[in-house]
From Swiss-Prot:
NCBIfam families: aroA (TIGR01356). This is 3-phosphoshikimate 1-carboxyvinyltransferase. It comes from Prochlorococcus marinus (strain MIT 9515). Its main location: cytoplasm. It is found in: Cytoplasm. The gene is aroA. Phosphoenolpyruvate binds at K25, G99, R128, Q175, R356, R398.
Amino acid sequence: MNTNDIRTVKGEKSLQGTIKVPGDKSISHRSLIIGSIAEGETNIEGFLYSEDPLSTADCLRKLGVHIPEIKKDQPFTIRGLGIDGFREPKEILNCGNSGTTMRLLMGLLAGQTDRNFILTGDKSLNERPMGRVSKPLSLMGGKIYGRENGTKAPISITGNKLKGCVIGTPVASAQVKSAILLAGLNASGTTSVIEPASSRDHTERMLKAFGADIKIRGELGRNIVIKSGNNLTGQNILIPGDISSAAFWMIAASIVPESEILVKNVGLNPTRTGILHVMDEMGCDYKIIEKSTIAGEPIGSIKVKYVSNLKPFKVQGDILPKLIDEIPILTVAACFCNGVSEIKDAKELRVKETDRLKVMARQLKKFGANITEKEDGLIITGESKFHSAEVDSETDHRVSMSLAIASLLAKGSTRIARAGASNVSYPTFWDDLEKLIN
């Protein structure tokens, strides 16, 4: 990760124009992973060419999957090995900074019998919690070992026969749910996942499209049941733009005076659109146009205009999983609302790439923001007058981009250290910012 570069952003600039954000990160990971266990070819278009999905591709190649060199903005085809076709790798599988890669592979590899695998990551990933995946997989018969009683990477997996069972997840996490469902493909009988709240459902949608026997039951899709025995068949996948990347421009257009931005072809999966509900609460001026559905995923273009006198908002409870990655940029937005905004029930942010609650509070205070950090969230008093500052992404991609948007509201020029962290999810972010600055 190239995080050492410093970027300078001049404040008091408006943003105008049309932008197409990179492909959805969640769907990019899953297209590779599910394509790799399908039979036949899977054609992928719109793939996010960034560090995290490329880590997934690299790991799958070491497991024997045919994945060509992936080039930016070019479609490609992978040849799957079937549900139980991975070979034992000769090397350690390095997941880089990608929690999705590590957690989903843990589920996928747990049932690959009589083969051994070791997963590791960078310094940040090796401190992130893996027990939430290793514990349910162990209940299914998985043999998973690691630091701190299997809760921290490096992780060692000895493939074993798994048995289907009913598992309640302690947090509403798409990564945990996906790991269990992928393990369920190789388990005897039926595997059922019960969530405390609805989380991203890209895995369920894609598994169904590939031919898995999967059913969603219960209120808000909280009970997902998968039955082993069905072979998966390769598909054609067109990946929409990532709403978590689009959120930076949607919020920027809302809070930067005289701004208007059209973001094209954004994924509008209802488990990801919490940001739109908060924008409604704030009184933002946006509309969704050019709506369609591709491979079971709704998409549309979002047009957003600046509004003065935005209202404060409260984020808590079941909406958190629908906007967990948007909390950093929403923290910036709250600084420019008229009143006190509150983010609660967001403890999960403390175990992301960084402790995002602490880092966002620390960095935005350098601009002059009025933020109080709580154990599970933030209280932000709006109507801030930002001044230029020396800030630092602290190696977190979403922090880097949030600070860039905050800098547009500051008087003078702001320097952002380790700005290149944005490459993890949005490699063209700084180029796109230059295009939009008016």
